């Protein structure tokens, strides 16, 4: 391979890396209800992902992953989801109550 070909491949890789870095940038942190809600949903999703990963590790026979660890992670995920659903229900009921108030 010639030096020019290597340099062109290197430039292409650098351009792709810059493009990938610009796509992967997280949104700036915002304060307020919406950002708190997004953070809470993100935490619920993370517990689900952790439980799924632990179950896959157990299924594949990864050393150090026991059945009780999998069950605990699955219960944590289930409880987090139930809490999220209940919070959503309370927020929806509160919103409906506020919308029904007379001014």
UniProtKB/Swiss-Prot annotation:
Pfam family membership, one: FliE
GO biological process, one term: bacterial-type flagellum-dependent cell motility
Presence of the UniProt keyword Glycoprotein in the record: no
UniProt-recorded Gene Ontology molecular function terms: cytoskeletal motor activity; structural molecule activity
Predominant place of localization: other
Top-level lineage group: Bacteria
PANTHER family (UniProt xref): FLAGELLAR HOOK-BASAL BODY COMPLEX PROTEIN FLIE, PTHR34653
Family under the similarity heading: Belongs to the FliE family.
Protein name: Flagellar hook-basal body complex protein FliE
Organism listed in the record: Photorhabdus laumondii subsp. laumondii (strain DSM 15139 / CIP 105565 / TT01)
Lineage: Bacteria, Pseudomonadati, Pseudomonadota, Gammaproteobacteria, Enterobacterales
């Amino acid at each position: 391979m010639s030096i020019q070909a290597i340099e062109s491949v290197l430039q292409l890789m650098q351009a792709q890396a810059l493009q990938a870095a610009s796509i992967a940038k997280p949104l700036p942190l915002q304060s307020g209800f919406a950002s708190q809600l997004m953070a809470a949903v993100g935490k619920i999703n993370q517990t689900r992902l952790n439980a799924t990963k632990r179950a896959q590790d157990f299924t594949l026979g990864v050393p150090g992953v026991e059945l009780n660890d999998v069950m605990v992670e699955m219960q944590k995920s289930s409880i987090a989801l139930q809490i999220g659903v209940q919070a959503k229900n309370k927020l929806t009921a509160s919103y409906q109550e506020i919308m029904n108030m007379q001014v």
